[in-house]
Amino acid sequence: LSRGLEDVYKRQAPKLQGTLEAGNEAAKAIMTTDTKEKEVAVQIEVGGKTVTIGGMCKGSGMIHPNMCTMLGFVTTDACISKQLLQEALSQDVKDTYNMVSVDGDTSTNDTVLLLANGMAENPEINEKNEDYQKFCEALNYINTTLAKKIAGDGEGATALFEVRIIGAESKEQAVTLSKSIVTSSLTKAAIYGHDANWGRILCAMGYSGAQFDPEKVDLYFESKAGKIQIIENGVAVDYSEEEATKILSEDAVTAIADVKMGDCTATAWGCDLTYDYIKINADYRS
C-alpha cells in the first residue's frame, strides 16, 4: 500500500497548483452523488499578517453525523499550535457538520481534516487569546457554510431546510429537538409539498426524548419571502395558508421553534424529501 501511495504521489505532485481553478478541480474530484462542488474560503488578519482559511467537502446521501458519508478538507496558512488547531476543529464540528442530516442514515466512512502550514508567518497562536477567537470565528464560518452546502445538496433535494430551536433549557435539549425535527421524514416531505404542517413538527419534538411543554411552544416559518407564525402556545393561529405556502416555496426554508424554557439555542440543517431521493437510491446498485 505504501509503495502504491508513493507511486501516486510521484505522478500527481508535479500537477499541484495553487490556483482557484485547481482548487475547484479538487472539489469536483471528490464528488459522488453530489450535484455541485462545495468550497469556500475567507481571509482574516492575525498579528498584522493576512491568514487564509479555505475548505471543500463532499456529501449528498447517507448524511447523518456523527458518522456519515462525507469528506471535509480545511486548510490554512495560519501559524497555530497543533493542540489549539485540534481543539478548534473538535469544538466547531459539534455545531456544524454534526448538525446536518439528509436522510438519517449513517456510514462508517467520514473524515474532516484541518491542516495548517504556518506560511502566513503570523505570531504563533498558542493560547486562547483574541487571535485564537478570531481564527475560531473564521473556521466556524467555513464549516457552517460547507455544512449548509451538504444539506442543501442532499440527494434529490429542492430546498435547504434549517431548524432553529430557541428558548431551550440547555444546549443538549436544543440540539436534540432540532435534530429530531430536521430528520423527520414526514416533516421533510411536508417541506417538499410547501405545507406548513405544524403537527408533524410537534410530533418530532415529542418523540425526541427531550422534555418540554408543548402548550408553550411558538412556531414560525421563515424564508426570503417573509416570516409567518404558525403556532402560539401550542395552538395554531389564524394564519394565511397562501402566505405560508409562498414562504415555504423558496429554496431555503427555516422553521423556528421557541420552547420558552431558557436561553439556549441550536441550529440543524437538512433538506426536503423528494421523489428523486427514492429514485436515486432505488436505482443504486452496489
Where are these regions (language model features)?
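Internal helix-turn-beta structural module
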Residues: 175-176, 183, 187-286
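Short glycine-rich or small-residue beta-strand-to-loop segments that form or flank ligand, phosphate
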Residues: 3, 54-56, 71-76, 112-117, ...
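A short beta-alpha structural unit
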Residues: 112-114, 158-170, 198-208
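Mobile "lid/hinge" segments at catalytic clefts and subdomain interfaces of large enzymes
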Residues: 61-121
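Flexible, glycine/charged-enriched surface loops at secondary-structure junctions
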Residues: 20-27, 41, 97-109, 145-162, ...
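A glycine- and small/hydrophobic-rich beta-loop-beta segment
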Residues: 118-193
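Single conserved hydrophobic/aromatic residue that forms the stacking wall/gate
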Residues: 1-9
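Contiguous domain-boundary segments centered on the initiation and propagation of an alpha-helix
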Residues: 12-46
